[in-house]
Amino acid sequence: AGLARPSAYQYYKSRQDLLHALVLDVFPRWAQRVEEAMRAEPDPADRILAYVLTNIALVAEGEHAVGNALAAVAPSEELNTQSALMHSQLLDPLVSTLQEMGSPDPAATAELINGIVHTATKLLDGERTQEAVEARVKELLEPYVREHRRTPGEQQS
């Protein structure tokens, strides 16, 4: 990002080192944006949509593409493990929200919702617009969110 290849190699010994540094830089900011968007929603059900739409926005902004491009040219088992761990950690606030809502299997439900995020990512990579992808996501998730939204006066448990 702004560095010529020779300059980047002065700082990083290999593509894997560069990618590792990129992941360590991007992931905390990504997770923070998702968590902030979720915290901004007072109702747990609305946090689900915030989780998905924020992830879609981050993908559309391009940070995910840089990591994917580097991973394609410098694949490694360590990177795959690190990436899987970070993606798993991104699910934590979603699982917590689903637990708060009383989901019978929050981990499985979170994986299903995250499947929507992954498919949305592929659609964005396939030249669909962010607006079109978000419209399809809302079409799928808003009925679930409406069904699980608290009624006025219902106490948070």
Label each region the model flagged.
Residues K13-D17, A21, R39-D43, A60, ...:
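Residues in soluble alpha-helical coiled-coils and helical-bundle/repeat scaffolds
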Residues A1-D17:
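Helix-turn-helix
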Residues L22, V26, W30, V34, ...:
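Hydrophobic recognition helices of helix-based DNA-binding modules
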Residues A45-L70, T81, L85, R150:
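Helical hydrophobic small-molecule/effector-binding pocket
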Residues A21, D25, E35-E61, I113:
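Hydrophobic alpha-helical connector segments
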Residues P28-A31, A50, L58, S76-E111, ...:
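Amphipathic alpha-helical packing segments from all-alpha helical-bundle domains
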Residues A37, L53-A60, A69-P75, L140-Y144:
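Helix-loop "lid/cap" segments that line or gate small-molecule binding pockets
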